[in-house]
Amino acid sequence: MSRFIIKKSTVLDQFNKIKTLADTVSYSFKTNNHVGYILREETDCFFSIHSIKSLDLLNCPERIIYFAQGWDMKEASHVYNKGVRDFVVDNEKDLQVLLDLQQPLNLMLRMRLKEHTVHTGKHFVFGFYSGTVQKLIPSLHSNQNIEKLGIHVHRKTQNISEWSLKSELENIFPEETLQKIDTINIGGGIPSTYKNFRAEVLEKIFAKITELRDWLHQKDIRMIIEPGRYIAAPSVRLETKILTVYENNIIVDSSIYNGAMDTFVTNIRLLIEGEGEGEPYTIKGKTPDSIDIFRYKAYLKDPKPGDTLTFLNAGAYTYSTDFCGLDPIPVEID
């Protein structure tokens, strides 16, 4: 029977690595809830969330950064009364709802940066334009209910190339605007390793993040980082059982629809433990869907029905669907 196995020590190792880069780490809870529960109990991590249900699941409102999206006064009041004080908004309507609360809080404006590898039509681009942010900051800075004012920026998942944040922010904000900002949240996007993604760029990315943090500290601005995939992916493996092998096809007792939706969403291919030698096989899930494919070609030595086939770095976005009557895959903590 298929199962996800979370290695707690890897979760904590990844957290501790990223913690050295920023003043605050806020884990993107949507990436993998089970990893979030470990971080809640074992670290001082904050959590970036997008729903009241996630707020209730975590039950630590003092460590929540809440992202508003199309909310109303009822939702905003409910979240605030639960104890949340840190908020991110990405449009003026959601901002006005928050201001109408007339309660003390910490606010971050989500700002869009110029994109070079993400195209509208497939991806929605979140955030205020930089000119709008600059117009809003003076009045928000003077608002007595806003205790800390910040900017949130985030490009995309698996961001391997666009990390020149220091130069971008320098070009956007004059010094008088930066003096009114308490916090910069750089979002997530730190890549993980897959068959079709190599993470050799991590050292350069970390150097860019450190450069930004040091520059912000010179201006007395705190930096928040929002890892999700970077912590969750390498902490989890997916163990499946081979049901049958024929004509260089392997059918496993799982499906991308309940075990690897990330395959669709971000076009990644999971690594397989022990691959590299033998014959090429296509690894297919157990549904009748022709695109239920974990890997189009993986070199394996003499796989047999009943063998365990283990996918590595499998912890990001493990949500499931009920397609063809599939059940969620059980999760175990190692």
Language model features with spans:
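Solvent-exposed alpha-helices and their adjacent loops that cap or buttress functional pockets
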Residues: 81, 101-102, 118, 185, ...
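Active-site loop/helix belt of alpha/beta enzymes
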Residues: 115-246
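Acidic/polar active-site rim loop that often engages polyanionic ligands
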Residues: 76-82, 114-121
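Charged (often Lys/Glu-rich) extended helix/loop segments that serve as interaction or gating elements
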Residues: 222-334
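Conserved, mostly hydrophobic/aromatic
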Residues: 11, 51, 79, 109, ...
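Active-site beta-loop-alpha junctions enriched in small/polar residues
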Residues: 28-34, 50-54, 69-71, 90-94, ...
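Residue-level marker for buried hydrophobic side chains located in beta-strands
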Residues: 47-48, 107, 184, 223
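A charged N-terminal "starter" segment
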Residues: 1-105, 141-147, 178, 303, ...
